[in-house]
């Protein structure tokens, strides 16, 4: 992890803004995630490290459930050219996902849905389902 004084850091090539970064503070004044999507959880780093070591198949179609800020999915796009759909029950997390996608120069799709409401239609084109820190 490379840290600097600009309130951001990189993890395996993915730029992440800290909660104290002015853009995150601005979003927090407008969008207030109701569940646990108010920060990046450490389990995201573990999942990203696993993908980097296991060499995730390039161009995979991935759904990230309980995405929060979407950092694991963004890492898959950035490092493996994956096509990622970020799913969360709390739509207030999507501005954070979109900001991180923008600063990493990648594109992800966002879908507001509870995990229990996902159905075959949502998953028919997906190859891999990922999630970190989603069992609480």
Across the structure, where does each feature detected by a protein language model lie?
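S-adenosylmethionine-dependent methyltransferases
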Residues: 1-136
């Amino acid at each position: 992890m490379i840290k600097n004084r600009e309130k951001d850091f990189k993890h395996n090539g993915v730029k992440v803004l800290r909660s104290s970064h002015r853009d995150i503070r601005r979003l927090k004044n407008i969008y207030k995630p109701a569940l646990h999507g108010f920060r990046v959880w450490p389990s995201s780093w573990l999942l990203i490290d696993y993908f980097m070591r296991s060499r995730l198949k390039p161009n995979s179609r991935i759904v990230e459930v309980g995405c929060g800020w979407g950092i694991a999915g963004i890492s898959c796009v950035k490092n493996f050219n994956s096509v990622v759909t970020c799913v969360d029950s709390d739509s207030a997390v999507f501005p954070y996902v979109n900001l991180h996608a923008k600063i990493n120069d990648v594109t992800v799709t966002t879908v507001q849905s509870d995990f229990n409401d996902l159905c075959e239609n949502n998953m028919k084109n997906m190859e891999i389902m990922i999630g970190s820190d989603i069992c609480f």
